[in-house]
Amino acid sequence: MQCPSCQNTDSRVLESRAAEGGRSVRRRRECLNCEFRFTTYERVEMVPITVIKRNGHREIFNRSKLLHGLSRACEKTGLTPSKLEEIVDNLELSLQQSSSREITSSEIGELVLSHLKGLSEVAYVRFASVYRHFRSVSDFVSTLEGMNADKAELAALV
């Protein structure tokens, strides 16, 4: 591992531990040349997932893009950045565990909405409005009515 301070390639590992719920290894290293200490992370290389956009265009799944959209929808809702990271982590893990290497953007949107539904109604509606391309107030109303119907069904079961 190359030292970020002097670019020497010889270092020793001082400490190793599991990180990110066991999905990576965090290593504390010391450069043998300048004694600078730095941290590295070792992760399993994920097989790329291809996202099929609405227009048929294909692109590699971009975790940052999804996290950014989720962050925008969840502004001022009380959901913490770590919770949003957890949502994206869970979604990415389920995509990696899937037998398919392709997924539509619609399927990703529905997966995100299923996570948001139980966490924040406001974030759910905001994300749905962008993802489902709401064009009028009636689109918002029908989504809210659907959420209320789901609540009524749950209340009837209890």
Curated annotation (Swiss-Prot):
Gene Ontology molecular function: any one: ATP binding
Residues annotated as signal peptide: none
Binding note for cofactor: Binds 1 zinc ion.
InterPro entries on file: ATP-cone_dom, NrdR-like_N, RNR_NrdR-like
Residues covered by the ATP-cone domain: 49-139
Protein name: Transcriptional repressor NrdR
Transmembrane segments: none
Example GO BP: negative regulation of DNA-templated transcription
